[in-house]
Design a protein with these regions (language model features):
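Glycine- (often His-adjacent) and acidic-residue-rich active-site loop
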Residues: 5, 61-105, 121
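Hydrophobic/aromatic residues within transmembrane alpha-helices
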Residues: 22, 59, 71, 128-130
Length: 134
């Protein structure tokens, strides 16, 4: 089974020969994690885990880095909350469900995940790498 990746997202998903490949797709910013990427990554991991034809997941990054951590530029330009905290990574505390965070999803899925490090992994990117099985 094979499916073509959707190029309009920050996370690419494809399946070929029982292997799902999930690619962080923001090479121009070294695949730094945005709120949108968090949501798309969790959704892709859950999709692969629920697909009975997928026996293994490969997590990788596009370009010259795996993931350089959180997108601090977006955080600095985002709105400030009432406590002065900056950023737009994820939703407000009342709306964000930690059970949907990619490291938690990685810990809870049954399908083995291989991290294909194609370059640097820093901060949150290192958390993602450590969350993989291999």
């Amino acid at each position: 089974m094979s499916s073509n990746p959707d190029q309009s997202t920050e996370v690419l998903y494809s399946v070929d020969s029982y292997v799902a490949t999930i690619t962080l797709n923001a090479p121009e910013r070294l695949n730094t994690i945005s709120g949108r990427m968090l949501d798309e990554l969790s959704a892709a991991l859950l999709k692969a885990n629920s697909d009975m034809s997928v026996r293994c997941i490969i997590l990788t990054g596009a370009g010259r880095a795996f993931c350089a951590g959180l997108d601090l530029a977006a955080q600095m330009s985002g709105p400030k909350d009432s406590l002065g905290n900056m950023g737009n990574i994820g939703a407000s505390a009342g709306e964000f469900d930690i059970r949907n965070a990619p490291p938690v999803v990685l810990h809870n899925i049954d399908t083995p995940v291989i991290c294909a490090l194609n370059g640097g992994a820093a901060g949150y990117g290192l958390d993602l790498a450590f969350g993989c099985d291999i």
